[in-house]
Amino acid sequence: RLAKEHTVLGLVAHGVCRGSVAVEVSDSEESEQSSAKQRLAKEDLVMNLMKVEVLHQRKYMKFSHVLAEFAHLMENHHVHYVVFKGMAMAQLYSSPSARTMGDVDFYVPASDFNRALEVIETSWKVDIDREKLDKHYSFDYQGIRFEMHYQIETFGSTRHQRYFNRMMDENVRKGTDGFELLDAVGGDSSVRVAMLSPTENLIVVFKHWFNHLLVEGVGLRQTVDLAVLLHNYRDQIEAAKLMSALEHIGYLPAFRALLAMMRKYFQLTGVESYCILNERDEQYADKLMATVLESGNFGRKAYKNYSAGNKKSLETARKAMAHCLKFFRLAPLDILCLIPKRIWISAKQKV
């Protein structure tokens, strides 16, 4: 149940199928009949998890095929872009298909954005939703939702926004990082999918995680993403550049608290290479983890009103206000300037 609430069932299923996670079914009774029931229940559970594993593999293959087609399209038309979160994160897992897939998020800098719109609409014959509710347009292709970002993340401070945008655009122009997928157009050859460099990738995933935690709430899926990212990039992240950038965008205290949480609850090593944590960081680590566990995937576990409408919008706003007060000292400027807007956007999306 917990795995479902936090959208990490694929990770559990993969672990069980590979023999790295043991399955036990408990029963208060101790009898031969009870033992037989437990064995049957265990067999049913394992079979269901095997089905989950197969479904995840099929879904990942579909995402890979479509994303390879997208990368081929962008490459042919010389469009600068990066894919982030989602499929880019999945590549850091030991088995990419174990991570639950959602949307395909990609960013195109302003210099290429309008041309990219025309290329996608013409080549894929899709209608792109251009409503500027948040920071991206959206469209569906082959049953997969694409979010086409004109801005990767939004900040309350204009100064912070300009610094962040400049950093991201410089990284996109360099085009040094990516991952390979089997080319859907070119047969047996592979196509390179552009992604952010380790330091920039961490900043984006962390900032996205923290903002969701403040508004709707955030679950283990997104939190495990950060743990995997920090572990896999431990020798590639430029610590001085990272900490300086986080200070420039007003999120350094929040990141320190995250590191404390990762060290305490996820046994992350090497935290000292970033900074020396203090007592306040440790205190916020406990608060962060408690909020993650009570939230579930994007806060759905904590909602009382599951249907859309005014009740859901009011509940979203109420919950966000409580989170903002609890974590105000971790990112005060953005909470004051940006979060009210994020609450309004999130509430409107739930109407």
Model-found features: residue ranges?
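Conserved NTP-donor binding/palm subdomain of two-metal-ion nucleotidyltransferases/polymerases, i.e.
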Residues: 1-29, 37-102, 108-351
